[in-house]
From Swiss-Prot:
Gene: sodA
Name of the protein described by the UniProt record: Superoxide dismutase [Mn]
InterPro entries xref list: Fe/Mn_Superoxide_Dismutase, Mn/Fe_SOD, Mn/Fe_SOD_BS, Mn/Fe_SOD_C, Mn/Fe_SOD_N, Mn/Fe_SOD_N_sf, SOD_C_sf
Cofactor names: Mn(2+)
Protein role: Destroys superoxide anion radicals which are normally produced within the cells and which are toxic to biological systems.
Species annotation: Mycobacterium leprae (strain TN)
Single annotated GO MF: superoxide dismutase activity
Keyword annotations from UniProtKB, A to Z: Manganese, Metal-binding, Oxidoreductase
EC numbers for this chain: 1.15.1.1
Family to which the UniProt record says this protein belongs: Belongs to the iron/manganese superoxide dismutase family.
Matching Gene3D superfamilies: Fe,Mn superoxide dismutase (SOD) domain, Iron/manganese superoxide dismutase, C-terminal domain
Length: 207
């Protein structure tokens, strides 16, 4: 069985400064994200052992561990692509139009997304996703690494609100971190995800 691996980044750790420090990015990538990758592979190995023994309690435990660690791996893999030293500004094209139609304006969307991030209790993510059943954009809070999200939603933009993503630089002032995040959003990546979600998902989950 092929193992999950830690992806390389498209930019140097210090490339997002002063908005997100190189120290944070290096620790975040090589320690935290790497731990999720290891957790996924460990959970899969333990699942194989549990299945071979028909140990259902161990199967259920490691399925939960797999969901958590795989969620962490997926979320962080999106996170690194969502960021760019050449980011910021605003989206364009179909994504910009859809944001305006859904939220009223980009500024209103940004305020709603930021409120979701700043208002998150405990650890998790704020997410802009595309609902493939309703064919609409949604913002929501993702709890921990995998909870509070219905199936069929494609993540487009995420901000990591776990303390390891900001505390070394912003301490407990989450609002400053979220404000800085907008300066490094890679809208080209978000637009690419939006185009794929709106054109390639038909029939994958819903007819």
């Amino acid at each position: 069985m092929a193992e999950y691996t830690l992806p390389d980044l498209d930019w140097d750790y210090a490339a997002l400064e002063p908005h997100i420090s190189g120290e944070i990015n290096e620790i975040h990538h090589t320690k935290h994200h790497a731990a999720y990758v290891k957790g996924v592979n460990d959970a899969l190995a333990k699942l194989d052992e549990a299945r071979a023994k028909d140990d259902h309690s161990a199967i259920f435990l490691n399925e939960k561990n797999l969901a958590f660690h795989l969620g962490g791996h997926v979320n962080h893999s999106i996170w690194w692509k969502n960021l760019s030293p050449n980011g910021g500004d605003k989206p364009t094209g179909g994504l910009a139009t859809d944001i305006d139609e859904t939220f009223g304006s980009f500024d209103k969307f940004r305020a709603q997304f930021s409120a979701a991030a700043n208002g998150l209790q405990g650890s998790g993510w704020a997410v802009l996703g595309y609902d493939t059943l309703g064919n609409k954009l949604l913002t929501f809070q993702l709890y921990d690494q995998q909870a509070n999200v219905s199936l069929g939603i494609i993540p487009l933009l995420q901000v990591d609100m776990w303390e390891h993503a900001f505390y070394l630089q912003y301490k407990n002032v989450k609002a400053d971190y979220v404000k800085a995040f907008w300066n490094v959003v890679n809208w080209a990546d978000v637009q690419s995800r939006y185009m794929a979600a709106t054109s390639k998902t038909q029939g994958l989950i819903f007819d």
